[in-house]
Amino acid sequence: MSPSYWLAGETPASRPALHGAIRADVAIVGGGFTGLWTAIRLAESEPALRIVVLEQAFVGFGASGRNGGFCEASLVHGRANGERHFPSEVDRLERLGRDNLRELIAFIHDHGIECDLEETGVLTVADEAHQVAEFHEWVTEANARGDRLVFLDRAAIQAEVHSPIWQAGVMAGPDDAVLLDPVKLCRGLARVATDLGVEIHEGTRTVSLERIPRGVRVRTVDSSAERDESFGIGRRLGLPFEPSALGQALIGSADDRPASGTVQAGHVVVATSAYSGWYPRLAGLFVPVYDYVLVSDPLTAAQHEAVGWAGRQAMSDANNQFHYFRLTADDRILWGGYDAVYHSGNGIGPRYDHRPETFERLEAQFLRAFPQLAGLGFPYRWGGAIDTTSSFMVTFGQTMGGRVTHALGYTGLGVGASRWAAGVVRDFILRPDSELLGLEFVRSSPFPFPPEPLRSVAVNLVRRELDRADRNEGRRGLLLRALDAVGIGFDS
């Protein structure tokens, strides 16, 4: 079964696994958006660098190929979250985010990347009465800062997209969000990176990093036989389950199989996001949270007329446990979100990719929004892990004496924010005096997650409190207010 609709029917490009010992200026672990953008931005800045990308499965296998294709300008998961954490920088971060989205779109056009880009803007809808007044306040405050949001009352929102439950909406333009096919973008980035001289090795699992004089030794094994959705340490060892992230780290560190490849690199970039459990130094910074998605059959002309949606905007609702939805290039509806499921021990693996109870819940919620589409089939359904920090923003750092740089924790914003983060990673390696590295946003680290079993208890307790707030007109209980007060921002 395909990891996502975007990958269905696709045969991933086969790039050889790494065998033997090589040297590189920079080794990048991870062939998703963060890894590919970092490779490109480094190569553009210093064409003489030898850069290698080491990907465990294939380019776009992880979150980069399983998301909804929403490419947003935000770096901080909303103005309110940015103000909570970085009040003195939030205006600049918003400008940087919009500049980044503009530059990303220009890059797509300049390099001829065909990724079904749709610059249609984003529409947020209210399905609860209390949200209508909040929308008025949101639009008033944002437009006073120079934004160009448009408030839509019930009649106006129904004219855009027909649903009996939506009471108001806020429209933002394509400078806030665009839609695209993330797998096509990934493949386009891989092509550009290769044209710039970057070497990409797929089916190459990184199992350890070792500090050596003037660099880091990266040890890899050939994982090409595990390049379908069932890959994993558990499968390789013949176990009936995938170990937790901690277990994977312990197994990896104890793995005495001969390395199929080694890279002696001046710098290493860890760009594995939710799959970063292999590098234990990052264990407290993030949790992998599973998000689930449905994609429908193509709409008939009559079904399309029944829902409207002529503007083809990206859409989401405004609940804590929110849904996101969109039309695909072939006129299917993608509907995802709501459940955000954490598995104990930073659990990650193919056994979590399909969750029937969540798919049933999503389908029922879809029919509540679009009862006129009863009977519409959903042939594609999948899940994937999102790397989440306690601040709901990407975090940066360096280990091994500055030789290893990481960026992770996008919390759903990685399609767009990964390009900006790649610029920060480039500056860590090439431009230590960069203004970006002086941002508190870049220098600070989020509040760490506690170890197990407290981690599971805390994450799942917060999920229940968010659900309670949604059922209580958005009013946050004592726990959520306390977390807000100490700068720990949680959402779905």
List each model region and its residues.
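Extreme N-terminal leader/targeting segments of oxidoreductases
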Residues: M1-V26, E44-S45, L49-R50, I233
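Glycine-rich Rossmann-fold phosphate-binding loop(s) that bind the pyrophosphate
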Residues: G30-T34, Q56
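Glycine-rich FAD pyrophosphate-binding loop
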Residues: E44-R66
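Glycine-rich active-site loop/strand segments that organize a redox cofactor
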Residues: R66-L96
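Active-site substrate-recognition segment that forms the wall
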Residues: C71, D110-E118, T206-R211, T262-A302, ...
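Rossmann-like flavin
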Residues: H85-V192
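Helical element adjacent to the flavin cofactor pocket in flavoenzyme catalytic cores
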Residues: T140-E141, G169-D222, A259-G266
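Internal hydrophobic alpha-helix adjacent to the cofactor/substrate pocket in enzyme cavities
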Residues: R419-G438
